[in-house]
Amino acid sequence: MRYEHLKTDYYNFGTHEDEVCRDYGDWFPTASLSMPLGNVQLSLSYRRDIERPNYSNLSSYTVYINRYTYQSGNPYLKPMYIHSLVLNCAYKWMNMTVNYSRINDAPTMSTEPYPGYDDPLVSLIRPINTRDDYNQLLLHIALRPVIGCWHPYWSAYVIFRDYKSPCADGSTITLNHPYASFAWQNDIELPRHWRLSLMAQWLPKGDTNNFRITRSVFNSFVGVQRDISLRSLGSLTADLRCYDPFETAKDEGIIFGIRELTSKNPARRTFMLNLTWKFNEARSKYRGSGAGEKQKARM
């Protein structure tokens, strides 16, 4: 059992606004049970958790996107509460998870007419809380064997939701098409500290919150990494990757809300070089960890 208390004061140009201020005191119970069944490890757990909005999403500051679109935060945004019941099953390099969640006040991006504008084409995008709570069921399976220098990773998951969203005509739509992902990643250890990475992922049509995917997507990347020893200075890792080499990651969808938007993103072949310098890997100096990590992450 965990208790959290958080108090936030909100000022608008120096004026204290009681309606936007927050004072939360919440209990977060957890319970878990685990047991072996032969060579299979089973666990069942329940927990209640909270996800507070990022501070940027609580700002009333408005950003210009283009002549028809503005974006802002929402100081009235409330945190999201999640009740989760998780069954996990593990056997050697295989893992299966079944996760049922009841989600309250989930945040979503809403597109609305811009207040004060006569042009009906001008829109304001801002985060809001969903009007209706919804259920979510996640089924996930992962296989991670080791075959010599080859480290394959197969994963598949499907998510079922009964998410409700308002429509432009004033009606309500239930977005309950399953959202799925099938991925195959390969890491191959090569001589002289070289590594080769290959990944392919298929995303079929489906619904994720208020976004309906109307076109299947195929993602892939190929990469090569090299570890370089810098002796007393640590080590340097060079990671060169090509994302979407076949330019197949085209996605299309519909964003439901007070205003409905059609989204189309073309495929783009992208190259990325990442250099990572690691030093003090032995952690000889105490770096500590604070109790405010979640609050810092919200920034």
Q: Each predicted region: which residue ranges?
A:
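Outer-membrane beta-barrel signature, preferentially recognizing the C-terminal barrel domain
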Residues: 19-21, 50-104, 123-138, 266-269
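Outer membrane beta-barrel strand-and-loop segments of large Gram-negative receptors
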Residues: 78, 95-155, 160-185
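Surface-exposed extracellular loop regions of Gram-negative outer-membrane beta-barrel proteins
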Residues: 1-36, 156-160, 181-206
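Outer-membrane beta-barrel translocator domains and adjoining extracellular loop/strand segments
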Residues: 9-17, 55-63, 68-71, 102, ...
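C-terminal beta-signal and adjacent terminal beta-strands/loops
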Residues: 228-299
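Transmembrane beta-strands of outer-membrane beta-barrel pores
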Residues: 3-9, 35-39, 46-52, 62, ...
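Residues on the lipid-exposed face of transmembrane beta-strands in outer-membrane beta-barrel proteins
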Residues: 31-35, 44, 85-91, 139-145, ...
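C-terminal beta-barrel architecture of Gram-negative outer-membrane proteins
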Residues: 158, 163, 182-232, 241, ...
